[in-house]
């Protein structure tokens, strides 16, 4: 498989804005003329329709609970083969799955060897985000956190 820009959008919790951020990034890449291949962790069928509306191509579910890791890897390789960038939207909290992190977004990122961009809901926090993010960055050395997007930041004006 050729090397393309690829990443997984994850968050510490559900409701952090993964879908909004994912769709926004997909739209930005499309506007730049890139062919974007969208993916969604888990069995979700609603978010995949949002992805398809933005990207004009099927969004593929990567579900390590319902399918083998080999099948998930094969789907990812096949559908991203002709893309310029692959964007995988996570589900729930990054490590939330069954039996700890089995079936989680973290498992998919590790399996595919792709970096993670965390979406952190900063609506009711400021400096307290630092230890939270430090925990995510250092919790599993086999999962690379490549960046953080702060969502719902408060704007202070003087």
What residue spans do the PLM features occupy?
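ATP-dependent carboxylate-amine ligase catalytic core
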Residues: 2-16, 20, 26-112, 120-147
